[in-house]
Structures are given as C-alpha cells and as structure tokens.
Amino acid sequence: MTHAAASRNLSFIDKLVGEVDKALRALSPDTKPHSRPSPKAECGELSDAEKRLSASLMRVNHTGEVCAQALYQGQALTAKLPEIRQEMNNAADEEQDHLAWCEERVKALGSHTSFLNPVWYTLSFSIGAAAGLISDKVSLGFVAATEDQVCKHLQEHLARLPQQDAASRVIVEQMLIDEAKHAQTALAAGGYNFPKPVKMGMTVMSKVMTETSFHI
C-alpha cells in the first residue's frame, strides 16, 4: 500500500471513529456539549396529565433532534465540497443545543427520552450519508425538506402544549426559529427543492417516528 493510500485509509478511519464518538454523545444521557444555555421561563402549576403530555411532546422533539443530528453527521461524512461539510457540521453543533434542552426538560417533567433513539439515529445517519453520496445539492435539499417537517411538528406541539407550561414552550419557540433558519440556509446554498411526492413520503416516515417516540 502506498503512503498516499495509507493516509486516505487512516483519514477515513479517523472520520469513522469521530462519528462513533458523536453518536455515543448524542445517545448517552448528560454527555451533550452545548454552547447556548436552555431558554428559561417560569412554569405554572401542571397537573399530572399535563406533565405527561408535555413530557411526551418534548420526548418527540428530542427524538427529532437525534434524527437531525444523525442526518447532518451522515451528510458531513460524505459531502463533496469542504464548505458544505462545514455547513453540516455547524448545523449539527446547533442541534446539540436542542438535544440538551429537550433532554433537560423531559427529565424535569419526570420522564425519559425515547428508548428507540439508537434505531432512529442509525436510520437517519444512513439516509444522510446516502444523500451526501448522491450530490451536495440533493443533500442540502434533504436538509431543507427535513427541517420543514420539523417546523410543522414544532408548530403542532406549540398548539398542544399546556399554556401554563412556559418552560417547554420557550424551548420549542427557539427551536422553531433555528430550524426555519436551517431550511432557508440549505436552499440558499443550492439545495434541491424536492417534489411533492417525495415530501409526502418523508411525512409518512416522520409520523411513524413521532407516534412511536410519543409513547416509547
């Protein structure tokens, strides 16, 4: 094996080790570095039923962020242009904030994150890596379409969260701002605008994720 080939192999192995480390951080409790503190708001008194509802919705949001984190990491691994790779890594860093915020809130409500997160992480990482292998344009388009789905879920959750649960609502509101920005950035960078049938298929997959993580 030539020195150049060995260097390429080492570089790829280094990347894989890095991705495994990121996956473990995303899926392990209390190991998520985040640059921004969780948005704070005074929470009113919640009944047991309201706590269960809020916890379930925030668990769904947490799983959504696990999927987003995996999607971005998969795309960063296979992105062809350095600037696209950096864009994916930057977005993944911001998703780390969301992950930590949601996990903290779920625990504060006396519940747990989804037991199926490893499954969703693996699936999302694979989809992201595959999209990156096709082209950066498709990869960016997938980001935009995914973030559109996330924004719809967040808007629905704002409508369902108890009004007095200001602590959860302020987190979701900030996440909504960030996710909308990710979608706009991806399209502005040249992302492919997926046709409606593709988006409908993504909606079906998204509903499976939200329904399972709401309960499990």
Curated annotation (Swiss-Prot):
Cofactor comment: Binds 2 iron ions per subunit.
Any one GO molecular function term: metal ion binding
Family per similarity comment: Belongs to the COQ7 family.
GO CC term, one of those recorded: plasma membrane
Binding, Fe cation 1: E65, E95, H98, E179
Protein's pathway: Cofactor biosynthesis; ubiquinone biosynthesis
Reactions the enzyme catalyzes: a 5-methoxy-2-methyl-3-(all-trans-polyprenyl)benzene-1,4-diol + AH2 + O2 = a 3-demethylubiquinol + A + H2O
Native source organism of the sequence: Saccharophagus degradans (strain 2-40 / ATCC 43961 / DSM 17024)
Chief location bin: membrane
Organism classification: Bacteria, Pseudomonadati, Pseudomonadota, Gammaproteobacteria, Cellvibrionales
Superkingdom as given in the UniProt entry: Bacteria
Cofactor(s) needed: Fe cation
Subcellular location: Cell membrane
Topology with respect to the bilayer: Peripheral membrane protein
Alphabetical list of InterPro entries matching this protein: COQ7_proteobact (IPR047809), Ferritin-like (IPR012347), Ferritin-like_SF (IPR009078), Ubq_synth_Coq7 (IPR011566)
Keywords, ordered alphabetically: Cell membrane, Iron, Membrane, Metal-binding, Monooxygenase, Oxidoreductase, Ubiquinone biosynthesis
Protein name per UniProt: 3-demethoxyubiquinol 3-hydroxylase
Enzyme class, broadest EC rank: oxidoreductase
GO process terms (BP): ubiquinone biosynthetic process
EC code: 1.14.99.60
